């Protein structure tokens, strides 16, 4: 079930951030890349079932790292992730989103030319068991 959730979350992020931004799962990207990156680790996806035990909806708490050589690009990715609206026609598998936290990350001097933030979101995700 976690693997399906990871795929759903990855495709949702890719659709939102569009081209020019790389989306990674399960590993820290190569910081030599010249483009913006978004990554989340499978270990950081925590699923909890909603109160309705017959439902396929779960809550997924996801920590997403956004990095870019350009602060404006990093901020634009954060904004696009936070500005999502959801309706009945949504086919992404993500039914609702709640913002939990956003903070800047400190990296070692070898990669400090990247602007990086960690965004924590709580997603209501439809997982077919």
For every predicted segment, state its role:
Residues 9, 13, 23, 38-40, ...:
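Hydrophobic beta-strand residues in large extracellular and virion-surface proteins
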Residues 1-52, 72, 88-92:
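Small/polar-rich, solvent-exposed N-terminal microdomains that initiate assembly or binding
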Residues 49-57, 109-114:
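Short, solvent-exposed beta-strand/turn "edge" segments of beta-rich domains on protein surfaces
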Residues 43-45, 67-69, 102:
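Beta-hairpin (beta-strand-turn-beta-strand) motif
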Residues 4, 76, 112-116:
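Residues forming well-ordered secondary-structure scaffolds
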Residues 55-72, 115-126:
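Oligomerization/assembly interface segments of phage tail-like spikes and tubes
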Residues 83-129:
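Acidic-leaning, charged glycine-interspersed low-complexity segments
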Residues 67-87:
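Mid-chain, well-packed structural core segment of small domains
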């Amino acid at each position: 079930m976690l693997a399906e959730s990871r795929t759903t979350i990855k495709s949702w992020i890719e659709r939102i951030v569009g081209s020019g931004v790389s989306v990674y799962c399960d590993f820290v990207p190569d910081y030599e890349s010249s483009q913006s990156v978004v990554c989340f680790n499978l270990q950081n996806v925590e699923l909890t079932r909603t109160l309705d035990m017959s439902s396929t909806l779960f809550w997924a708490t996801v920590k997403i790292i956004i990095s870019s050589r350009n602060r404006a690009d990093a901020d634009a990715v954060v904004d696009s992730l936070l500005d999502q609206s959801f309706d009945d026609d949504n086919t992404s598998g993500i039914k609702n989103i709640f913002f939990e936290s956003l903070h800047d990350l400190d990296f070692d001097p070898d990669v400090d030319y990247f602007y990086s933030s960690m965004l924590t979101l709580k997603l209501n995700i439809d997982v077919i068991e």
